[in-house]
Amino acid sequence: MKMKIFYSSILFLALFASPVSLAAQDDETKTGSDCQTIDDADALKNFEKSKDRKKYDWEQRKGFLQEAIAAQPTWAEANLAMAKMIMTKAKADGMEGTYPGAIRFLKAAVDNCPKIGADPFYWLGTQYYLQENYKDAVVYLQKYIDYDTDDAKKLGDNYEFNSSQALEMLRWSKFYVDIKNHVRPFAPSPVKGIDTQRDEYLAIITPDNTQALYVRRIPVNQADRVWSSSQQAEVFTMSHMQPNGEFDKGTFMDDPFNKNPNEGAATLTIDNKHLFYTITKDGTDGPNTDIYTADLNDGSWTPIRSLGDKVNDPIYWDSQPTISGDGNTLYFASNRPGGQGGIDIWMTKKGIDGEWGVPINMGPTINTQYNEKSPFIHTDSQTLYFSSDGHPGIGGYDIFYSRADATGKWKEPVNLGVPINTTGDDVGFFVSTDGATGFFNSNASIPGQVGGYDVYQFELYPEARPEATVIVKGELKDEFGNPLTGATTVEIKNVQTKEKSFGVVDTITGSFAAAIRVSKKNDYIITIKKDSAAFNSQLISGKQEFKGVVVNAEPMKISQLKVGGAYTINDINFASNAAVLEPESMVVLEMFAAYLKEHPGMKIEIRGHTDNVGDDGRNMDLSNERSYAVFEALTKFGVPRSQIISAKGYGETKPIADNATEAGRAKNRRTEFVLVKF
């Protein structure tokens, strides 16, 4: 196991740089005090002689201490003096490192006299730490941190600095103890179809599991690229999922891609229509790596374009983008100045004008003074995976995950554990939308290895999984059945938590995709916001069993508001033969109430309708009662009574479909609002 010491030179400086720390304390060691009272005259005489540097050399003084300890093995002061002599001599001889010869004397000192001082606990804990005996390091470093005394001298000369070092060593030691005791299940296998005899890496699988994007290294004579001058060429490649559940062998990305010798590290929005990836180009100051984007319009990719000067630095490395589920936050790695260390993870948000803002550093919770890279934000938009050589780990780069709390604050990163993380560099990790499968790139010798670098998958243990997520895909139509075009917002609200998120909308085709978290079986309501558009919503019940990662919503018809127009409010249901609203219907009405309050100048009439089953008179009465129930619910949610002109039932007198079929009758059983004034 590779030990990643944050700065071993600082540790040694803290231990041994000042002669006051060790050597001078030899003369200050007292018998008795808080420790044992020694009555052995010969032992006391030898102890005193061991402190006389002028009369005796180091070997003689050591011999006197050995005789004293032999006579009184539990004598704490003598044992401590011996430990300090050993460490001081080692430093004088230029032998900075671990000092196993001192450990038994330090241990005898603190075990027989815990009040002897704080420093021996620090030295002992540090020695165990440097020897990778993390279990014992935890014990003695914790005792150093917890050392309680009113005597400042017993805390030592460098207590403030040593305390900060001890806390850091304690953090790492606890990590190593924990990771050793929690070996994670790990049975990786190659991803069929993607992996070939060639190298495949920098891979990502789209959230809907239909496509894979990666770099494939191939011989130059197959690459057919004039810019290739080496024996191998890196080609940006895409594979598609086949009906048998395997990816095809992949094809090179056509124009506008593969025009540069270094392209890849891609990410796609959840509708698979907006791609972000990395290109290295020659700049005025040499090669420069930046993030670029392209959009899929009518089956073809638009010309690639830079994310712009706000995001891309003209000098520094900007790479490895990953996009959030709503398409509005992009995370990436960069070595630009202004961060916490070397390579940091940054984020940029898309404004209402569609432009990306100035990047923000993820801060010291995620980034360290070393390097963090290879970020992957899961489709749940609240679980971030990344690689780091700064957080406690076992290799060069280890994989970590962090979760955002309800306020958006990122929690302390967690190491993914062994054997997932190795003593090498572990990067390029991502997770399936349902959260159950982890993916990574490796050229290690793993059972089933196909080529050099391959893409592997494995079942991710539950604690490290993101919240299971599905993608809701739908079509927005205008009142004539044509694709809804122009600026449109798809809002998704968690009924139970009230949390809001947004879908990705194609303003040309009217299609949309939205991510919803389904682990907690919460209900969601989708509402559409567009200038001068009538209220429209669709309820997605968390009680249903989701098969696969894609849920197809019913097409949503968005009508333009017109005075006199009647608009159905979807998902308004009542108890059988009663005017009692179902709980999920109250959610819809709460959203409709918010819509009305956003348009205070709007005045409406609520209308209730039934099918033709049953008595005509009873249907009329029931529709009246139900329309009034809707009116009461809206006023309960804060809609002024003056905004609702009336609530009236029409029974079965105004059908909009054929009552001869169940589907027709279902359409006729409806609640509408009619626009009276706008």
Regions found by a protein language model. Give the residues of each.
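Periplasmic peptidoglycan-binding/tethering modules of Gram-negative envelope proteins
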Residues: 36, 463-603, 640, 677-678
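Periplasmic OmpA-like peptidoglycan-binding domain that tethers envelope proteins to the cell wall
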Residues: 388, 392-395, 599, 607-678
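Short coil turns that delineate tetratricopeptide repeat
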Residues: 73, 114-115, 149, 600
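Short, conserved micro-motifs composed of acidic
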Residues: 29-38, 116-119, 123, 130, ...
